[in-house]
Amino acid sequence: MVTQDLLNAAKIRVRKTSSNVLDEDIKQLAEVAIRDLERIGVAGIYLSACTDPLIREAVLTYVNANFGANPDRDKLMSAYDMLLIKIKGGGYRA
């Protein structure tokens, strides 16, 4: 679930301070990242509020990589993939 706190953090990550229709795009990207974490077996307790620093960073990195036409998308997706590897080995399963 994308909380308001997570949405605000994602907006800051993509350097967006105003609220408008693009907030829905950011929220959708965060939801995709959360579902991807769920897909690799992360327990729901870690995904309900995304307060764990590693989980939160993965979501924010995914949003940053995929929002708009980020010229650093490939580097950011590599960073996201590395975070997934760390999460897989970090005891985040139920």
Predicted region positions:
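Divalent metal-cofactor coordination and adjacent catalytic microenvironments
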Residues: 1-94
